[in-house]
């Protein structure tokens, strides 16, 4: 069976979704159900998963028994902040080890600071975490993160929240060809065709939040993204026909024609 394998666990869905930017937890739940996602990512610094007693908790709407939580470090600008945030998440989620690391470079672009990211990844891996890492689309950096022991690399397609789609498919393709761990596109997806293209390139999965949450109809878009990821994966496995400027062979048979 064709499944996504991350840190020794298999998942049927290759679509990973965020939990932020929805109007309320009810809409969050409805969109995630429509997406079919099994892995959901949560910003520990922005979302209550038990650290704020007396306030509504995401855990009440998306129980950890139903989903694999992927705590992330959105809003962290240093390795120290990221490590501290994920250690807190591990305490709140009873020893949970699978995490998404992102260390941002500046608040305008949210581009990853790779020096701080590598520093944090080293510490987290030594501390027993399974690290899925948000990174630039630099093939050398991606390979270094794999060699360090990261569970997955997640290069950006374009800037977080931009909806610009895949701006550099060639770098993504190099990363995919060189990798022995899952490569997932993270950031920049704007619509279903972007997700399909990522999967057609050979990505093992796609992670998104804003593309669904900021849609006019988030629940409908979540369903569209599910279909796009599935179609893109099947197209990759099927193998597309070669590109040609023109074809000398007609698509219809020529034998047996009259005259």
Curated annotation (Swiss-Prot):
Transmembrane segments: none
KW DNA damage (keyword) present: no
Positions annotated to bind 1-deoxy-D-xylulose 5-phosphate: 161, 187-188, 209-210
Record's keyword annotation contains Nucleus: no
Pathways involved: Cofactor biosynthesis; thiamine diphosphate biosynthesis
Keywords per UniProt: Cytoplasm, Schiff base, Thiamine biosynthesis, Transferase
Family: Belongs to the ThiG family.
Subunit organization: Homotetramer. Forms heterodimers with either ThiH or ThiS.
The protein's name: Thiazole synthase
Native organism: Methylobacillus flagellatus (strain ATCC 51484 / DSM 6875 / VKM B-1610 / KT)
